[in-house]
């Protein structure tokens, strides 16, 4: 078999655990690729969302039960979280799968993996999406040797980090965004709109409720200040259906009313015509870089989260696109720096043909080569490694 491991004739059980929407999408794609290789000789069990349900997974519990963010929220719901961890561990051990694949959400999935390894060391474990060991708590990489057999990395620099930190074997399989380059790149008409006046300014306050609440005021005030300074722009705010109500309420008092677009398709259409963006730091920075949209990034969180982060996060950029490019071309304004006095000049600088704008665009031009996985898709590469680990277990 080309790339895929031969696993014999018996039906293989793959147990997957994904507790967030992004992990749910990765899990569904992995299920499709494994089924393409094994046909009827594979069955799936585990925890997932709507995408994995579409591939036939009956989730152990709804992943919405874990849709929380912030230290305070975790503390308040800790008994429920611990109960779900125990439930997941017991379910894995009862299923006796040929492999356990944990997908992202390390605060939950790694606790499950450690307990499974302690109680049944015979079950091989693959971690799909590396924790950010290169940014904070690097000792986690070495600790993972005790309960993870292979890490599937979405970022090209991560395998070298695992070698440096003496962690488990790690392979770059590719970021799922590499399969979506076309949907983020403008056609001729969209490029013309991108270069026309007034320029489209994307406003991206976050993809979670707490993120929207933390960033809305500063972003709204920044738009108002730009308007008062005579800067021409059209503000567009993409959001998701489950956040639409919160976003509309948050921007109702803004002096500059953005055009709100809802859903992934309309979001990407907005990216294709955007001239610049003001964004909460996160995966969206890599999407914007792929789309060729220069950006200013910001990050605000609760005081407890920031206090903890400043004691454990390694110095340096936390912007995903900067990390991938290996160059700090995108400015970031964190916590007390996330204020209009600093955001306004940075955004204004990107709305013109400035050195700062040109420097970002030059960095974005390298993204395709850096993220390339050749002819194989990320989910295909991931499936082959999962099968290989299963074969050698």
UniProtKB/Swiss-Prot annotation:
Reactions mediated catalytically: a lipid X + a UDP-2-N,3-O-bis[(3R)-3-hydroxyacyl]-alpha-D-glucosamine = a lipid A disaccharide + UDP + H(+)
The keyword Coiled coil is annotated on this UniProt entry: no
GO BP, sorted A to Z: lipid A biosynthetic process
EC number, as in UniProt: 2.4.1.182
Pathway(s) this gene product operates in, as recorded in its UniProt entry: Bacterial outer membrane biogenesis; LPS lipid A biosynthesis
Matches recorded under Pfam families: LpxB
Family membership: Belongs to the LpxB family.
Annotated protein name in UniProt: Lipid-A-disaccharide synthase
Name of the gene this protein is made from: lpxB
């Amino acid at each position: 078999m080309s790339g895929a491991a031969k696993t014999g004739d018996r039906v293989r059980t793959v147990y997957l655990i994904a507790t967030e929407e992004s992990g749910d999408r990765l899990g569904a794609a992995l299920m499709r690729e494994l089924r393409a290789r094994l046909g009827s000789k594979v069955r799936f069990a585990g925890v997932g969302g709507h995408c994995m349900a579409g591939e036939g997974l009956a989730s152990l519990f709804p992943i919405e039960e874990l849709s929380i963010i912030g230290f305070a929220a975790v503390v308040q719901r800790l008994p429920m979280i611990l109960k779900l961890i125990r439930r997941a561990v017991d379910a894995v051990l009862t299923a006796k799968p040929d492999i356990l694949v944990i997908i992202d959400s390390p605060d939950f999935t790694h606790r499950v993996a450690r307990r499974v390894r302690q109680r049944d060391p015979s079950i091989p474990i693959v971690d799909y999406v590396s924790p950010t060991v290169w940014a904070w708590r690097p000792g986690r990489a070495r600790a993972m040797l005790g309960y993870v057999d292979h890490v599937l990395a979405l970022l090209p620099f991560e395998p070298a980090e695992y070698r440096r930190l003496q962690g488990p074997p790690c392979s770059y399989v590719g970021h799922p965004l590499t399969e979506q380059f076309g949907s983020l790149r403008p056609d001729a008409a969209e490029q013309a709109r991108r270069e026309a006046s007034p320029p489209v300014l994307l406003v991206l306050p976050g993809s979670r409720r707490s993120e929207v609440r933390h960033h809305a005021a500063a972003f709204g005030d920044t738009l108002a200040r730009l308007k008062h300074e005579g800067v021409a722009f059209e503000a567009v705010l993409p959001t998701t259906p489950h956040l639409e109500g919160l976003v509309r309420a948050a921007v109702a008092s803004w002096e500059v009313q953005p055009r709100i677009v809802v859903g992934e398709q309309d979001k990407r259409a907005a990216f294709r015509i955007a001239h610049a963006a003001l964004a909460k730091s996160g995966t969206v920075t890599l999407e914007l870089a792929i789309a060729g949209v220069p950006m200013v990034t910001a990050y605000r969180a609760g005081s407890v989260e920031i206090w903890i982060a400043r004691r454990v996060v390694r110095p340096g950029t936390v912007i995903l696109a900067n990390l991938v490019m290996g160059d700090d071309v995108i400015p970031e304004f964190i916590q007390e720096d996330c204020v209009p006095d600093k955001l306004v000049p940075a955004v204004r600088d990107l709305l013109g043909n400035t050195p700062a704008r040109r420097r970002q665009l030059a960095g974005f031009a390298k993204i395709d080569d850096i993220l390339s996985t050749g002819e194989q898709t990320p989910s295909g590469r991931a499936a082959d490694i999962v099968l290989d680990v299963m074969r050698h277990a």
